[in-house]
Amino acid sequence: MALTGTDRVKRGMAEMQKGGVIMDVVNAEQAKIAEAAGAVAVMALERVPADIRAAGGVARMADPTVIEEVMNAVSIPVMAKVRIGHYVEARVLEALGVDYIDESEVLTPADEEFHIDKRQFTVPFVCGCRDLGEAARRIAEGASMLRTKGEPGTGNIVEAVRHMRKVNAQIRKVVNMSEDELVAEAKQLGAPVEVLREIKRLGRLPVVNFAAGGVATPADAALMMHLGADGVFVGSGIFKSENPEKYARAIVEATTHYEDYELIAHLSKGLGGAMRGIDIATLLPEHRMQERGW
């Protein structure tokens, strides 16, 4: 029996990226820098989150020409983003042959009621989450990989830390629940009880959970790995820094060797300025991308 497109295959593809760094790129040149630095995959888009935030307006799926340019430039997997709920954008990316689709809050949501039914696709999906309720709902919809939402395009790690800690704390709580407590918790979280039962049985999420949204330095990446991340997405942090090549290599090394503090200290020397960050407290509620999705 062919397993193409099954949860087993799609989750297995995501597992292969575990321990690695996935970098946002906007052209072939950046994609080659990411691959040379050791990225396990790249996310092809027209603008990094910091530029999307600055430009405002409606952010949509990237021009397929940009995505194909990146796909032709590198041998590592290529991801691309679609708007939340935009089934047709996802079908277009699947037709292009991308390796993963990110149903992303970085783009302007297309549907304020429904996320994409990811079970209908052969290509695996990655989705963001802030808590176990969001994580479980995305898994039930067919997500093969999760990531913290953080606050994209800010260079501020605080929200990614908050989301990773919250998900892991809620997992620990679920693991110790009785069946009746589990049913009540599912109702409280708005989560399918079947997914919570699987989490309880495994003692963890059934899919990998990467850190994303605010990673800007090697130390940020190492911190998220310490908190239990399975890997790291870096959006604006690399190509909005003063020295993208150095930052890319340093973040990859810090993610792999996140317990080697002497190495991280060495990696952090002479990098040049990190991307200019934003204090989350200064963002108006309507400018907080993490609030998108349900």
UniProtKB/Swiss-Prot annotation:
Ranges in coiled-coil conformation: none
Name of the gene: pdxS
Top enzyme class: lyase
InterPro entries membership: Aldolase_TIM, PdxS/SNZ, PdxS/SNZ_N, RibuloseP-bd_barrel
Catalytic machinery residues: K81
Family the UniProt entry places it in: Belongs to the PdxS/SNZ family.
Name of this protein: Pyridoxal 5'-phosphate synthase subunit PdxS
Annotated keywords: Lyase, Pyridoxal phosphate, Schiff base
Organism: Geobacillus kaustophilus (strain HTA426)
